[in-house]
């Protein structure tokens, strides 16, 4: 049985949270950029061009690709032959999310109790999806889930 300290999980999750908000997956920028030539609509080409410009600007300035860094969603494949020492897995993940979002100066937008609407100021708790898999390793992936616009006004339908 392999032992993995919870501090290693915390450190890894912190790095993943920052990276997920600052860098696109490999090849994604090129995919969007390549779509510009194939797109028929001038408006769509313009929007895709703006997205590529935003990606480049964010990389140059070292800031998040989107201002809505959202809720941290963590996917974990935990080997059945792993023993986590120290803190509980969920606590280690949430500590990593807090470190990543606070140290990375990412937008803190999670509320503890939705009815009170009080911000936790560290973007926890995260949504954590776990799978127990064969082996003695832990594989972690972070995916920020943006929230979109919070001040929504729905107009009444037009009557004919």
PLM regions: where:
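Residue-level detector of conserved catalytic or cofactor/ligand-binding positions
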Residues: 152-160
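Translation machinery proteins
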Residues: 39-63, 120
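A generic, well-ordered mixed alpha/beta core segment in the N-terminal half of proteins
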Residues: 70-134
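Flexible, glycine/charged-enriched surface loops at secondary-structure junctions
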Residues: 24-32, 43-48, 62, 102-116
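ATP-dependent carboxylate/acyl-activation modules
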Residues: 148-150
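Acidic/polar, glycine-rich intrinsically disordered N-terminal extensions of enzymes
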Residues: 1-48
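Short beta-strand segments
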Residues: 64-67, 75, 131, 141-145
């Amino acid at each position: 049985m392999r032992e993995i300290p919870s501090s290693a999980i915390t450190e890894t999750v912190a790095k993943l949270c920052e990276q997920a908000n600052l860098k696109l997956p490999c090849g994604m920028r090129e995919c969007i950029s390549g779509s510009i030539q194939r797109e028929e609509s001038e408006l769509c080409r313009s929007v895709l061009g703006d997205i590529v410009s935003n990606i480049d600007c964010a990389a140059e300035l070292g800031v998040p690709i989107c201002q809505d860094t959202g809720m941290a969603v963590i996917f974990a494949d935990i080997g059945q032959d792993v023993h986590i020492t120290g803190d509980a897995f969920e606590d280690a993940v949430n500590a990593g999310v807090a470190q990543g979002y606070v140290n990375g100066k990412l937008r803190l937008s999670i509320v503890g109790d939705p009815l009170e609407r009080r911000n936790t100021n560290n973007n926890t708790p995260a949504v954590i999806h776990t799978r127990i898999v064969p082996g003695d390793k832990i594989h972690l992936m972070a995916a920020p889930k943006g929230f979109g616009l919070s001040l929504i006004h729905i107009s009444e339908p037009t009557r004919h």
